[in-house]
């Protein structure tokens, strides 16, 4: 009787430890995933914003997808409002 209770208690403790370890690994995975996404996202934003807001004139063009604003003389997104 004492042996079966001891084995049951040991099994429950072992189950608790395994569940806790796997849960802590699962918590680390989203953090690593989000940090890698934001690292890649920040690299993309640097490239995307490379021309947005840069000073320009009609001789010195902007990046593709941007046009030189006639009013403010900086690069803005191309659209019907920029004509």
UniProtKB/Swiss-Prot annotation:
GO terms for molecular function: carbohydrate binding; ion channel inhibitor activity; toxin activity. Residues 1-21 form the signal peptide. Residues 22-49 form a propeptide. InterPro entries: Huwentoxin-1, Huwentoxin_CS1. Keywords: Disulfide bond, Knottin, Lectin, Secreted, Signal, Toxin. It is found in: Secreted. Its main location: secreted. GO terms for cellular component: extracellular region. Expressed by the venom gland. Disulfide bonds join 51-63, 56-68, 62-75. Belongs to the neurotoxin 10 (Hwtx-1) family. 51 (Hntx-8) subfamily. Hntx-8 sub-subfamily. The presence of a 'disulfide through disulfide knot' structurally defines this protein as a knottin. Agglutinates erythrocytes. This is U5-theraphotoxin-Hs1c. It comes from Cyriopagopus schmidti. The lineage of its organism: Eukaryota, Metazoa, Ecdysozoa, Arthropoda, Chelicerata.
């Amino acid at each position: 009787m004492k042996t079966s209770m001891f084995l049951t208690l040991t099994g429950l403790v072992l189950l608790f430890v395994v569940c806790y370890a796997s849960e802590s690994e699962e918590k680390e995975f989203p953090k690593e995933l989000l940090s890698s996404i934001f690292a890649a996202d920040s690299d993309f934003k640097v490239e995307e914003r490379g021309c947005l807001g840069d000073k320009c004139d009609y001789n010195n063009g902007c990046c593709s997808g941007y046009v030189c604003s006639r009013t403010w003389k900086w690069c803005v997104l191309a659209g019907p409002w920029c004509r």
